[in-house]
Amino acid sequence: MSTQNSAYSAFSSLLAEAAMPVSPAELHGHLLGRVCAGAGFDEAAWQHAAAELLGGAPGERLKAALSGLLGMVRQDFSAGEVAVVMLLPDDETPLAQRTEALGQWCQGFLAGFGLTAREGSLTGEAEEVLQDMAAIAQVQGQLEDSEDGETDYMEVMEYLRVAPLLLFAECGKPLEPAPKPSLH
């Protein structure tokens, strides 16, 4: 089982236990959308936004998991990665469920991005990325469970792994570099 799937399963369980009406994919997409729109990596602001999305204050275990999710996203952006890690079901999950989760991820991203105040207008390229995400959010369940469907899903997922980086470069707050130790 991959780390990505372990995190997805863990979040699914936590959200189900707390009777929260949000999928792990939507939650992760929401966080990434906020970060890419310029919300930064403030823990308190993320916990507040997550509580609003979840429809109530999360319990301690879920709060800790939300903090870990923020750390994972921060790591993606601070490590100079060329793609983000998406919180989605593994490849063994039926294609229809993976496609639904991908659509939920896009919905969450668009909501997080849209709810975050930004300065200035977007470039045409950034607007195109957001339009693509809106279209992908509507595709839920429309891919056939076939080799072509798998190929289409993988291509869309790979696109979505790099698309947030363009939006982050345009709108996101630069990461604060870690303080360098002083030598005495």
Curated annotation (Swiss-Prot):
It comes from the Bacteria. GO terms for cellular component: cytosol. InterPro entries: YgfB-like, YgfB-like_sf. Belongs to the UPF0149 family. PANTHER family: UPF0149 PROTEIN YGFB. This is UPF0149 protein PA5225. It comes from Pseudomonas aeruginosa (strain ATCC 15692 / DSM 22644 / CIP 104116 / JCM 14847 / LMG 12228 / 1C / PRS 101 / PAO1).
